[in-house]
Amino acid sequence: MVREKIRVSTRTLQWKCVESRIDSKRLYYGRFILSPLMKGQADTIGIAMRRVLLGEIEGTCITRVKSEKIPHEYSTIIGIEESVHEILMNLKEIVLRSNLYGTRDASICFKGPGYVTAQDIILPPSVEIVDNTQHIANVTEPVNLCIELKIERNRGYRIKTLKNFQDGSYPIDATFMPVRNVNHSIHSYVNGNEKQEILFLEIWTNGSLTPKEALYEASRNLIDLFIPFLHAEEDNFNLENNQHKVTLPLFTFHDILAKEKLRKKKKEIALKSIFIDQLELPPRIYNCLKRSNIHTLLELLNNSQEDLLKIEHFRVEDVKYILDFLEIEKHFA
């Protein structure tokens, strides 16, 4: 029997940054390539890197606001243009950079009139603000705005719940993710008789770290996940002897349902973070959706085809375009 030779590339894999730019203080962009890869490897690496970049990179943000003068979240403060809710939303958008662990205290103590911006936040030494010009509130009268802040470093999302509300203390929906978006694409080519691939990876960050730093941290996280397999000895996988048998945990239907509910919740949170601005839709479709207050992918998927056709100036062709573009027709009931 003649065995086919398996070709293995002798060239060393190399990462290279082919484009890097700063669009604003809160939007960094980087484009990287990895090559040469064997057929199928680019997709494997691209999917893994995208998941880690979006879900495993730690970030820092404001998670709680406290003030004894605030009766409830939807109240207003005399002498301040914004409502308490609007101030909380502005604080949520503040981008912070730090290497802290645990929780730190910060504060704002501003005497009006004047504009309160991110530079007015009194921070601990381990934390710095990425964009000092970010707006918080407009104090229109000579009154004091004094609030206490909690700052945390974590990963992913934290949605505020009723349990987290305390007297004069209000939690903020925390988005710890410093990576705003990730795209990967693959270029295939033939090198002699061998099919090879180049992986292109695009990374957008919020300015708290550069795309290159995010790529380094994601790579390190992936390596840490696989290190236990490198240290495992062969006899640890020998299940022939009774002493090496593995006892599997028992799951009840309640456990299974709880996990499924958690999975759906995580998916919903992820869809909330994808804005239609990122979908590169035609201007006319994009403007129609915006006018109908559809801003995220989750909001778009919550509309049926009939709902979309009720939008002013929206046509059947537009609905078909969206279905074809997203390739997720099954999500529309």
Swiss-Prot record:
InterPro entries: DNA-dir_RNA_pol_insert, DNA-dir_RNA_pol_RpoA/D/Rpb3, DNA-dir_RpoA, RBP11-like, RNAP_asu_C, RNApol_insert_sf
Region feature (Alpha N-terminal domain (alpha-NTD)): 1-233
Ranges for region Alpha C-terminal domain (alpha-CTD): 267-333
Top-level taxon of origin: Eukaryota
Keyword terms: Chloroplast, DNA-directed RNA polymerase, Nucleotidyltransferase, Plastid, Transcription, Transferase
Pfam families listed in its UniProt record: RNA_pol_A_bac, RNA_pol_A_CTD, RNA_pol_L
Keyword Iron carried by entry: no
GO BP terms, alphabetized: DNA-templated transcription
GO CC term (a single one): chloroplast
GO molecular function terms attached to this record: DNA binding; DNA-directed RNA polymerase activity; protein dimerization activity
Enzyme nomenclature, EC number: 2.7.7.6
Top enzyme class: transferase
Physiological role: DNA-dependent RNA polymerase catalyzes the transcription of DNA into RNA using the four ribonucleoside triphosphates as substrates.
UniProt free text on domains: The N-terminal domain is essential for RNAP assembly and basal transcription, whereas the C-terminal domain is involved in interaction with transcriptional regulators and with upstream promoter elements.
Family: Belongs to the RNA polymerase alpha chain family.
Oligomer status and interactors: In plastids the minimal PEP RNA polymerase catalytic core is composed of four subunits: alpha, beta, beta', and beta''. When a (nuclear-encoded) sigma factor is associated with the core the holoenzyme is formed, which can initiate transcription.
NCBIfam families on file: rpoA (TIGR02027)
Protein name: DNA-directed RNA polymerase subunit alpha
